[in-house]
Amino acid sequence: MANIKSSEKDIRRTKRRNAANSQNRSRLRTQAKKVLKAIKEKDQKAAMTLFIEYTSLLDKAAKTNLIHSKNADRKKSRMAKRLNSSAA
């Protein structure tokens, strides 16, 4: 355990951030699974609304540096390709 007050505060801050980050990462994975499930079930309307929510979550995650912005762009692009190929 840290002996310095600022170090103790840093540990508390890190725990808080870690909890928030893991929650947001989990939310991203869950949303991706929901979109893929809707695509698999050929439910185009639901897949589209879920995809819009997913892209929003990705953009927010990129904005807060949870994931890199290019990583978010790549995930959006690949999911859009899957969505478009299922529509055809």
UniProtKB/Swiss-Prot annotation:
Skewed-composition ranges (Basic and acidic residues): 1-11
Which keywords fit this entry according to its UniProt record? Answer: Ribonucleoprotein, Ribosomal protein, RNA-binding, rRNA-binding
A biological process (GO) annotation for this entry? Answer: translation
GO CC annotations, alphabetized: cytosol; small ribosomal subunit
The ranges of region (Disordered) come to 1-31, 69-88
Q: Which SUPFAM superfamilies match?
A: Ribosomal protein S20
The leader peptide range reads none
Q: What does this protein do?
A: Binds directly to 16S ribosomal RNA.
Annotated NCBIfam families:
S20
This protein is called Small ribosomal subunit protein bS20
